[in-house]
């Protein structure tokens, strides 16, 4: 299993396929979905990291969670692999990390796809905001994937949730000026019943200079990039 030492973190990542590089960024408390890599690998060299405290990457207890730090870890991994520039595809939290990379490292991103991602915490629906603010880590059942993959063990689940909660309850906080700094052509995908407010998705679409907005009918938060993302990227 490949790991890279980046920013004091022993980061797990997977690489499959040939072609132009594409960085896949998973959602919160997850790893990259198994079917995701084979979908893109026939066309791209897919690089799929797992962020701190998630998937097969251990938690660093002394370092708080912030989307910006995840973005910097991802850029450091790209540098470690000799990847100067890549398409970036992110789901949920991964899309937020992708936005951060595109804002602060525009030269690194050739194209950007986000699904179910917000630019501001207030872009979540009121119900989602309330859930994230009142999340009780001790009452959330351990995800099977976390228990199976985490080097920290299943007992660390409430600990890492408690550490993630301040980020989830307050971030991201990108301004329209931040979004206007994105140079890469961008595809924003949301479900019409997503946790992202539809009006917020429109605000993001208007603020990002080279953006397209795709609203998937009869879809909730579980929409993963598919054919619409692939046609946009190639």
Task: Set out the residue ranges of the language-model regions.
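Conserved alpha/beta-hydrolase "acid-adjacent" motif
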Residues: 195-200, 224
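Active-site nucleophile elbow and catalytic-triad environment of alpha/beta-hydrolase enzymes
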Residues: 162-178
């Amino acid at each position: 299993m490949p790991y890279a030492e980046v920013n004091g973190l022993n980061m797990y990542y997977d690489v499959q396929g040939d072609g132009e590089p594409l960085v896949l960024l998973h959602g919160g408390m997850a790893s990259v979905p198994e079917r995701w890599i084979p979908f893109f690998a026939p066309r791209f060299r897919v690089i799929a990291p797992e962020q701190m405290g998630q998937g097969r990457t251990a938690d660093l207890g002394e370092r708080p969670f912030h989307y910006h730090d995840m973005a910097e870890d991802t850029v450091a991994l790209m540098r470690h692999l000799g990847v100067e520039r890549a398409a970036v595809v992110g789901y949920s939290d991964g899309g937020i990390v992708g936005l951060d990379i595109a804002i602060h490292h525009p030269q690194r991103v050739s194209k950007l796809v986000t699904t179910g991602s917000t630019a501001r915490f207030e872009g979540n629906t009121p119900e989602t905001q309330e859930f994230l603010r009142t999340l009780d880590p001790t009452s959330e059942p351990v995800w099977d994937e976390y228990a199976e993959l985490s080097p920290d063990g299943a007992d660390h689940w409430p600990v890492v949730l408690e550490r993630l909660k301040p980020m989830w309850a307050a971030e991201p906080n990108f301004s329209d000026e931040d979004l206007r700094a994105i140079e890469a052509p961008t595809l924003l995908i949301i479900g019409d019943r997503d946790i992202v407010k539809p009006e917020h998705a429109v605000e993001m679409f208007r603020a990002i200079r080279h953006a397209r907005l795709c609203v998937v009918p009869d879809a909730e938060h579980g929409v993963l990039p598919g054919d619409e993302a692939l046609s946009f990227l190639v």
